[in-house]
From Swiss-Prot:
One of its GO terms (biological process) is translation. It comes from the Bacteria. InterPro entries: Ribosomal_protein_uL29, Ribosomal_uL29, Ribosomal_uL29_CS, Ribosomal_uL29_sf. Pfam families: Ribosomal_L29. This is Large ribosomal subunit protein uL29. It comes from Cupriavidus necator (strain ATCC 17699 / DSM 428 / KCTC 22496 / NCIMB 10442 / H16 / Stanier 337). Keywords: Ribonucleoprotein, Ribosomal protein. GO terms for molecular function: structural constituent of ribosome. The gene is rpmC. Belongs to the universal ribosomal protein uL29 family. Gene3D superfamilies: 1.10.287.310. One of its GO terms (cellular component) is cytosolic large ribosomal subunit.
Length: 64
């Protein structure tokens, strides 16, 4: 997901996206802890996506 795509969403949509990403991150962490996760690079991708969403939310909040 690109930051330009995120900038087109409103704050409610971004908060929902953030919530889904945090749930996905938790699930991936549990899979990693129980050694069920095959593709560990997914953790990095989700972490970066969370950072992107939080950055766009902060930018929108500071713009007001």
């Amino acid at each position: 997901m690109k930051a330009s795509e995120l900038r087109g969403k409103d704050a409610a949509g971004l908060n929902q996206e953030l919530s889904e990403l945090l749930k996905a991150q938790f699930s991936l962490r549990m899979q990693k802890a129980t050694q069920q996760l095959q593709n560990t690079s997914q953790l990095k991708k989700v972490r970066k996506d969370i950072a992107r969403v939080q950055t766009v939310l902060t930018q929108k909040a500071n713009a007001k």
